[in-house]
Design a protein with these regions (language model features):
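N-terminal, positively charged/glycine-rich alpha-helical extensions of SAM-dependent methyltransferases
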Residues: 1-24
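Conserved alpha-helix/loop element of class I SAM-dependent methyltransferases that forms part
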Residues: 31-50, 66
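Class I SAM-dependent methyltransferase SAM/SAH-binding core
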Residues: 52-109, 133
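A short acidic, Gly/Pro-enriched loop at the edge of an enzyme's catalytic core
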Residues: 107-118
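A short SAM/SAH-binding and catalytic strip from SAM-dependent methyltransferases
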Residues: 117-132
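A short glycine-rich, Lys/Arg-flanked "PGG" loop and its adjoining helix->strand segment in the class I
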Residues: 132-142
Length: 142
C-alpha cells in the first residue's frame, strides 16, 4: 500500500518481504504447490510446443522445474521480483534443464516483444497493483 493510493502495493516493501521469506518459503507454501500442480495438469489439454516459457512470479522455482520436465525442448525463464527466491529456485533446477533466472517485475517485463511462447503464473497476480498493465505485458511478450 502506498500513501498516494491505498490500494497500490509498494513494490519495494513487497520485494523486501519476499527476500526475507525465501529461505523458509517452501516449508509453508502448500497452497502454492497444490495450485501449481493443478495448473500443470491443465496443460495436458493444451497442444503447444513452446520454445521459451516465462514463469512469471516463479518464486522458489517448483513450477519452472515442472515446466522444464514437461516441455523438454523448451527453455524456461523463471522471473521473480525477489532475488532470494531465485537463489532458492536455482537449487530446485536439474543441471541439464534449460532454465534461466531473471529478477524483475511482472508489471514491467525485462523481455523483448514477442520473445516467449507461453506465460505461466501461479498465484502471483495478487501481488500486482495494475492487472491491466500485467496483461498488456504478457500480450506484448507473447
Amino acid at each position: 500500500v502506498t500513501e498516494s493510493n491505498p490500494f497500490r502495493l509498494d513494490k519495494r516493501l513487497l520485494r523486501v518481504a519476499f527476500e526475507r521469506a525465501a529461505s523458509d518459503y517452501d516449508k509453508v507454501a502448500l497452497l502454492q504447490r497444490e495450485v501449481g500442480r493443478r495448473l500443470l495438469e491443465r496443460l495436458e489439454l493444451v497442444r503447444v510446443t513452446p520454445a521459451l516459457i516465462l514463469d512469471a512470479g516463479a518464486g522458489t522455482g517448483h513450477g519452472s522445474t515442472a515446466l522444464a520436465r514437461r516441455y523438454k525442448e523448451a527453455r524456461v525463464l523463471a522471473l521473480d521480483i525477489a532475488h532470494a527466491m531465485l537463489v532458492q529456485a536455482r537449487r530446485h533446477r536439474a543441471w541439464f534443464r534449460k532454465q534461466r533466472f531473471v529478477c524483475g517485475d511482472i508489471e514491467s517485463l525485462p523481455l523483448a516483444n514477442r520473445s516467449v511462447d507461453m506465460v505461466f503464473s501461479n498465484l502471483s497476480l495478487q501481488w500486482c497493483g495494475d492487472l491491466d498493465r500485467v496483461f498488456e505485458e504478457f500480450q506484448r511478450v507473447l
